[in-house]
Swiss-Prot record:
Protein name per UniProt: Myoglobin
Any Pfam family: Globin
Gene: mb
Family in the record: Belongs to the globin family.
Enzymatic reactions: Fe(III)-heme b-[protein] + nitric oxide + H2O = Fe(II)-heme b-[protein] + nitrite + 2 H(+); H2O2 + AH2 = A + 2 H2O
InterPro entries per the UniProt record, alphabetical: Globin, Globin-like_sf, Myoglobin
Role: Monomeric heme protein which primary function is to store oxygen and facilitate its diffusion within muscle tissues. Reversibly binds oxygen through a pentacoordinated heme iron and enables its timely and efficient release as needed during periods of heightened demand. Depending on the oxidative conditions of tissues and cells, and in addition to its ability to bind oxygen, it also has a nitrite reductase activity whereby it regulates the production of bioactive nitric oxide.
Subcellular location, principal: cytoplasm
Molecular function GO labels: heme binding; metal ion binding; nitrite reductase activity; oxygen binding; oxygen carrier activity; peroxidase activity
Annotated positions binding O2: H60
Residue ranges the record marks as coiled coil: none
Compartments reported by the entry: Cytoplasm, Sarcoplasm
Annotated binding of heme b, by residue: H89
Length: 147
């Protein structure tokens, strides 16, 4: 079974609450790695204790998870999805690759807790994200961004 399939087995729980789960992912990312909150200008002024209930954080978290869902459902054939995302994250947002690694670990933990992603699924999600991050790195190099 393809790694994406293992993760998608639990994806229904994520889709049922994109905002709640996405808000949890970003809230944990920002609390565990406060430097990442500074990468989102609209979230800079939000106090740590106000992140979880913030509508904008939840909405952006939902956007992140919906894009991840597209990538998973593409089952590795994701160039058309990933190249524009990599381009904006390089040229507009200036997001270094390590930040994708940080959010991967948060995603793994939140999906384990909220969607029942088991140990095999967690390993599969890490492998999927390793491929995605490797491809982002390739696109970054193509456009001259030292991410």
């Amino acid at each position: 079974m393809h790694d994406a399939e293992l993760v998608l087995k639990c994806w229904g729980g994520v889709e049922a609450d994109f905002e709640g789960t996405g808000g949890e992912v970003l809230t944990r990312l920002f609390k565990q790695h406060p430097e990442t909150q500074k990468l989102f200008p609209k979230f800079v002024g939000i106090a740590s204790n106000e992140l979880a209930g913030n509508a904008a954080v939840k909405a952006h978290g939902a956007t992140v998870l919906k894009k991840l869902g597209e990538l998973l459902k593409a089952r590795g054939d994701h160039a058309a999805i990933l190249k524009p995302l990599a381009t904006t994250h390089a040229n507009t947002h200036k997001i270094a690759l390590n930040n994708f690694r940080l959010i991967t670990e948060v995603l793994v933990k939140v999906m384990a807790e909220k969607a029942g992603l088991d140990a095999g699924g967690q390993s599969a999600l890490r492998r999927v994200m390793d491929v995605v991050i490797g491809d982002i790195d390739t696109y970054y190099k193509e456009i001259g961004f030292a991410g």
